Structure formats: C-alpha cells, structure tokens
C-alpha cells in the first residue's frame, strides 16, 4: 500500500486545518477564522485499503511576539524534516508577500518535494489564481505541482489527495485503520474547549488562553467526568471568559460538551475553571510541559 507522512506549511490562517478536515471527510482539527488557532503539531491519519496518509498539521509559520510563538514556529519547522511530502499552502485572497516568502524559504531548505496549494480560490478570480500559480512555481524549488482548492466548498481536495497518493512510496501501515489521530483524549478535549473560546471571544482573548485537562474519569453512572482549567494572563481576561453572571463560560462549556459527547459517543460532565497565570505565554515550563510543545519539537 502507499503510505507516508505529509506535512502542511503555511502562514497562519491560510486554511491548513480546514483543508485536512475536508480531505479526510470529517472534523478532526479545530478551526476558526482567527489566525494562530493551531498551536501544536497534530498527526491526522487517513486510511483505506490502498493507502495510509499521515497529515502533519502544524502551527502557522510567523514572526513571533511571545515565547509561545517561538516554540510554535519551531514545531512547524521541525515538522518539515523527515516527511515524504510537504503541502505548501497559501491564501488566494491574501496573495504572496513577505510572510509567504518566509514560509517558502523554510520549505526550500527542507529539500523535500512539495505540492503548492492555492486555497480559498472561491474568494478571487481566475486571473489572480493563475498569477499566484506562476509565482509559486518560480519560488518553490522542489515543487512538483500546483493544486487549487477551496476547503470550505470541498473543491480540489480529491485532486489533491490523488496527487499526494501518487507521490508517496510503497510502505508499511504505521497506524491501526480505525485511528484518526495519535493525540490522546485529553488533548482533543483541550482543543475543543479552546476552539469554542476562539469562536465566542475576540481580539487578544483567544490568544491569551491555555486549556489544560486535569482529570478524565468515568463515573459509576456511566457519565464521563472531565475537569479542565482555562488559564489567562490577567484578571480582566478572566472576567471576560466567565462573562456576566457566568453566561460566557456556560456558553463555552455547553458547546464544547456537545462536541466532546459526539467524539466519545456518550454523556459528558464538563467542569471548567478559569485561572490567572500571569505572562504564561513567556514561561518556558508552561509552554513546554503543560501545553506539550516539548514533544512537538522532538517529534
């Protein structure tokens, strides 16, 4: 069978996670319209009788403002090493500028063959897409093809998957056929909660939040009890997350619980607590150990 690892590279908010979800035909990765939603490297496994593709979703490559951002970029760049193929993704509407050139440099340095992906083509005209294609072909030294996609409309994703499979080697099956990610339930829960915070809050709030699952335990009545802490930088942010009379934390909790119940196939009691850890985004221990960046850089 055809098997291999396929890393995604691109600046924040080009639709890398949405693209993977569209290709595998289910929501595995959290998504939002805000940049830097993805913080960790996540393997998404797509298996059939003929192939197993392991998509390595990565944080957007950007110039960081905090230590957290530095580790995110390290995780993204390290993911480009040792894979069989790279999908270099750009946003058709944003075009190609300095941030894209920054990404292209890292991709070229990896010496790994790449497929250029022009995503969000539904937002621009054909002429602009053709111009972007020519630039990508010129700037990406190991580019084997360019594919035009719209992840939200599921356009071009089948063509992209076919091209990926065509360029993967014959090899062993790395993961069981029913496995869709190598991340544990605690990680998936923290990501779902964080996605809801991204959805319901604005400006700096989503980026100032870390979600750490402290306990997962099945109770005697069969309900899965999950306790998680939501960490923020400042007391004012804590007040926004909790909301007037607890309305915001209730909304976040209800929406997250519904998705977690779908994930585990059973009833869930989600116990959320909001705590302040000042300047946590610049503290190495929290970033490396509690958020798991240490493993992302080593993988």
From Swiss-Prot:
GO terms for molecular function: GTP binding; GTPase activity; ribosomal small subunit binding; small ribosomal subunit rRNA binding. It is a peripheral membrane protein. The keyword RNA-binding applies. An essential GTPase that binds both GDP and GTP, with rapid nucleotide exchange. Plays a role in 16S rRNA processing and 30S ribosomal subunit biogenesis and possibly also in cell cycle regulation and energy metabolism. It comes from Thermosipho melanesiensis (strain DSM 12029 / CIP 104789 / BI429). One of its GO terms (biological process) is ribosomal small subunit assembly. InterPro entries: G_ERA_dom (IPR030388), GTP-bd (IPR006073), GTPase_Era-like (IPR005662), KH_dom-like_a/b (IPR015946), KH_dom_type_2 (IPR004044), KH_sf_prok-type (IPR009019), P-loop_NTPase (IPR027417), Small_GTP-bd (IPR005225). Residues 36-40 are annotated as: G2. One of its GO terms (cellular component) is cytosol. Residues 2-170 form the Era-type G domain. It holds the Pfam family KH_2. It is found in: Cytoplasm; Cell inner membrane. This is GTPase Era. Keywords: Cell inner membrane, Cell membrane, Cytoplasm, GTP-binding, Membrane, Nucleotide-binding, Ribosome biogenesis, RNA-binding, rRNA-binding. GTP binds at residues 10-17, 57-61, 119-122. Residues 57-60 are annotated as: G3.
